[in-house]
Amino acid sequence: TGVQTCALPIYGYQIAGFADRTTLVDNNTWNNTHIATVGKAMASSEERAYPILRKHDVDYVLIIFGGLLGYSGDDLNKFLWMIRISQGLWPDEIQEHKFFSNGEYRVDDQASATMRNCLMYKMSYHRYNDLFGGRAGMDRARNAMGPSTSPTLDTLDEVFTSENWLVRIYQVKKEDTLGRPLPLAHAFEQGKRLHQAPFPLNADAIVH
């Protein structure tokens, strides 16, 4: 109890019912600003999304990713309506056309910089290449290759990924105790890990 999760509104009831946790929005949310806020966080870069999540006391972020399983009803395929709702309130900050590449909604290396840098994209493909020996992996939901390099996250920690990678949960980091910007603190920790045993590059590395 006391833990708040950020997810698409359609998952709010399930999270509340099965996990006894509150969500920022759910199916019954009538306040369009709340829904747009979730969309804004997902559509923003980590740098811009982190203050939004912290302001609303979000502890965890849950997404549904169908790339490995081939589930086309995942959050990346629902992402555009989140972008549109957010653009309605913040047209100067969230602009749908910036998520397209030459008019196409792409997820491979030809995806737009805005798409590749947004929180939704990073959470979806974080460590995905680990399953394919470090190479780009096939996204079966979109019938396209994913990015050649898996995105890294500075402000979130992966705490759960289901065996088929459908459910992914990330914990929002607290501010660094030494006052460092989180990207700098993360880079320092990554440097320390280079001297430790490597994280296994296969599906067994999933956090259960």
Predicted regions and their residues:
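Extracytoplasmic
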Residues: 1-208
